[in-house]
């Protein structure tokens, strides 16, 4: 080894020891005939002092981020010079030798100062030397080890599934890879290990997991990555309760890494109640502000805007004090989300109603509205009217915006909830409106994925009333973020074919795209279920990071670009020719 100790482990008890440290120059300070270096490695920082003429002369050439090795004697710092802000602050190393292991060019940014994200990502190897980014990646390693330990206790088998496979419709666009040896054909990078893990259950593996890399060619979004990671699990001979139990055990141990004990059992809410009360299938329960149903209240209204299939409201405490300009900005906020605006009523100090909408109400509506929605004098009532799903979603977003503006969210709080019993199907046109891809060509598509089992009591309604069918599914939500999604799976060919048919995948097309899975179901497929945790988001929450990019070693930007390697990049004409990307596939006779 080139060093005897880590820079962050030395203490008073090590005084008098001869040590060799290796790391990077974090700071250099010249004090008239003495040079002080803060030497940093992955374990921390130790101050090295250069007094002896030989090493002092060498130390003059040191600059920030030079990689060096220092030998010397551990000494207790002179009285008054201790640094209580670092664990090694009571000692220093009196250097007797210095070796420069690697010089550093002038830095593109100072590691102890803020820098723009694109610059940080271009020089990510420098960014990760900083305490915050580096600590987040190291925490991720502990998170992986902790999850593996829990699953090992329960006899799970870690199995790697293919990362190049065939393209199958799973709800997003595939990344395609040309198959050189079969010109005109393509592999696809997997959007998830879903099909393979189900086949592993048919294979008798019974308890499977992997930390899986997944790929989705989605439209660019601020906090999405084209390549992401899941903790993927599947179990045979289980129901939803079994999967939820092991999931809660994993989550409990993960959050213990940061000193928080998750109260057990984690509460549950139905999908329908989550949408009705919070306007979201991933509600943030760190604060109140529930939505109020107003459809019946306005059932006889003459106000045409509220003559809608759904009318709802959310109250902003103290919101009546907002200036007109701010209230106008709320309208722009709603329009950015695809709505015409956000109607509002102000409750004045004497309890009367103000604002442009209130004049359209009847006397009876005005007299009872504040009581109905739970508003007090000085509050603002926001409304949305129209189709229930989109109107509730707008109010749910407004609920979160209100909480942020009023400081209602405790940043140190944790709120977990299982959202259960979602619909199995949704209208395909509604899915495509929000950027999702319909699996088939039918009027309905899967809410989760096409392999989710309906709850048994709804099997007879699959064809006759798809919109009423509930899925045997469960999502785990933390602080308004979905961090895991799971379900009991279909394990019967006839049920799977019926679900495909509702989504517009008739037997011939289903056989072409999923024949291998359907055939496997004919060989005694066991009941099975599982869950996949969004590992990047889970790690970001544990590390206290806003963006998942902070917990990925080499992430892409929101535009899907890697500033470090300048990927994606064009290919040469020779590469294009060899790949066969322009070759038409041979017709199957």
Curated annotation (Swiss-Prot):
Cellular component GO terms, alphabetical: cytoplasm
CDD domains membership: AspRS_core, EcAspRS_like_N
TM spans (from-to): none
Compartments reported by the entry: Cytoplasm
Annotated stretches, region: Aspartate: 194-197
Site (Important for tRNA non-discrimination): residue numbering on this chain: 31, 80
Composition-biased stretches (Basic and acidic residues): 575-589
Top enzyme class: ligase
The keyword Cytoplasm appears for this protein: yes
Domain of life per record: Bacteria
Complex and partners: Homodimer.
Name of protein: Aspartate--tRNA(Asp/Asn) ligase
Lineage of the organism: Bacteria, Bacillati, Actinomycetota, Actinomycetes, Mycobacteriales
